[in-house]
Amino acid sequence: MPGPRIYERHEVDELIISLEEILLDLDNHRAQLQELKIRINALEMIWGEDLRESSCADHHEYKSHMAEMEKIQGYFKSCADKIGELGGQVKGLNPPLIDFYGVQDGHLVFWCWTRGEREIGHWHHIDEGFTDRREIAEQP
């Protein structure tokens, strides 16, 4: 089985527009999810545990909101899958942190990208994370 795809920095730079589009769509769904959570919390405050009983007047609305939340959470996974299809590894969603395998000074590293960066300007070793990232000019 072949190993992971290794990217040149410029190849990842070319994917940033696609990453931003996926994340924008994710933001829209995140806002919907937040609204659903607010509605569910309000219903829970009004009805308490009775909300889960089919005899509760707002039970159907509650179930509908819960189903929609599950659907949106599934959509989050599909967004992560889309990023994976581009070769990225999602390391965080808020803020979005995405890594791509690369080579820096002969070492296997992650090119490290977060939202708002127009190009890959940072990297970190594969056993490190975002807080350990270095500017491209820095040596290991």
Model-found features: residue ranges?
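A generic structural signal for ordered alpha-helices
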Residues: 4-7, 11-14, 47-50, 54-57, ...
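Short, surface-exposed linear patches
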Residues: 27-30, 49, 56, 114, ...
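Residues in flexible loops and secondary-structure boundaries
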Residues: 14-15, 34, 48, 91, ...
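Structured domain cores in non-transmembrane regions
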Residues: 35-73
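Amphipathic alpha-helical coiled-coil segments
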Residues: 19-36, 65, 69-72, 76-79, ...
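Glycine-rich, aromatic-bearing surface loops/beta-hairpins
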Residues: 70-140
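Long, hydrophobic N-terminal alpha-helical segment
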Residues: 1-46
